[in-house]
UniProtKB/Swiss-Prot annotation:
Signal peptide: none
Protein name, UniProt field: GTP cyclohydrolase MptA
Cofactor(s) essential for the protein: Fe(2+)
Organism, scientific name: Methanothermobacter thermautotrophicus (strain ATCC 29096 / DSM 1053 / JCM 10044 / NBRC 100330 / Delta H)
Family of the protein in this entry: Belongs to the GTP cyclohydrolase IV family.
Length: 318
């Protein structure tokens, strides 16, 4: 007995002919092993979202083709062992547009936990640290074929210390010390001690567009984000480490705005070779300890715009 030919309901004309921007699947979980020459492979458990647009004259997309496209590309990656995460998403976008001939746009996003090793600042104890890495790709059909733009990113947790509250504590301490010390001694005392403040658990995020002939490593983005807050955080800290982290953070207080500007400055310094039209998104969310709300700051710009602000404007003001 042969296979039964079922009717293709998706190809019917919808009762309400409206174009849909994104239709697809979310939360597709996969196992991905990335081989590295001379080093241990990276094992990821990424989650994929995959979408195409839908013309107004078609009732539905062929939904099974989306997870099928993800699986097909991942199998190919396992065989070749050579593909960056953002390029992986771009390949899935390309496969989606092949499978959905009626679509003019496809979009794939991926996020995964990423483990890396880090040593504590004083005792040098090694521990596994977890962070998030992301990749996106968007493809369009035009008269010349398929145009794809891809991005790589990371999100890292760190620690921030509020400068405003710290200055208030410093001034209150000054007034207290002046009750029994002279001005010069008070200033000497204030200059050699750290002052209390309220802290935040900060989450920094960077997403950078990756031009076709360029490579941006997620590990470098992790470094940039960590170094842009008051202090990194660690899974394992002994007492000397804990003291060092707290002291270091309070010697380096930052607003949420400072963190974003620090990341922007480091991105401009680290990637002078990226084209001016490269899109960059930088975001910081600080989870407050003494408020019920959180603090947020963001910068979305091209590399050319960032370079102008950092180099031209700052140079003119110096």
């Amino acid at each position: 007995m042969g296979l039964v030919c079922f009717p293709d309901t998706q190809d019917k004309i919808p009762s309400i002919p409206v174009h849909l921007t994104r239709v697809g699947v979310t939360g597709v979980k996969k196992l991905l092993k990335i081989e590295r020459e001379g080093r241990r492979p990276i094992i990821l458990l990424p989650t994929f979202d995959a979408f195409v647009d839908l013309p107004s004259k078609q009732r539905g997309i062929h939904m099974s083709r989306n997870p099928e496209a993800i699986s097909d590309v991942l199998e190919e990656v396992v065989e070749n062992n050579a593909l960056e995460l953002e390029s992986l998403c771009a390949e899935i976008v390309n496969e989606l547009l092949k499978k959905h001939r009626y679509a003019r746009r496809a979009e794939v996003s991926m996020n995964s936990d990423f483990m890396f090793m880090k040593r504590s600042p004083v005792t040098r104890r090694k521990s596994q640290e977890m962070t998030k890495i992301m990749a996106d790709a968007i493809g369009y059909r035009d008269d010349d074929g398929i145009v794809i733009r891809k991005m790589i990113g990371a999100e890292v947790v760190g620690m921030t210390v509020c400068p405003c509250a710290q200055e208030s504590v410093r001034e209150a301490s000054r007034q207290k010390l002046l009750e029994f010390l002279d001005d010069e001694t008070v200033e000497r005392v204030l200059d050699c001690v750290s002052f209390a403040s309220h802290n935040q658990s900060g989450r920094g995020m960077i997403m950078i567009e990756v031009p076709e002939d360029q490579t941006i490593r997620a590990e470098k983005l992790i470094d940039i984000i960590e170094s842009s807050m008051s202090s990194p955080v660690y899974e394992l800290l002994k007492r000397p480490d804990e003291n060092a982290v707290v002291m270091s953070a309070h010697e380096n207080p930052m607003f949420v705005e400072d963190c974003v500007r620090n990341m922007v400055h480091r991105i401009v310094s680290e990637y002078p070779h990226l084209p001016d039209d490269t899109i960059v998104t930088v975001r910081q969310i600080n989870e407050e300890s003494i408020h019920r709300h959180n603090a947020f700051a963001e910068k979305v710009a091209t590399m050319g715009e960032l370079r102008y602000e950092i180099e031209e404007l700052n140079g003119a003001g110096s």
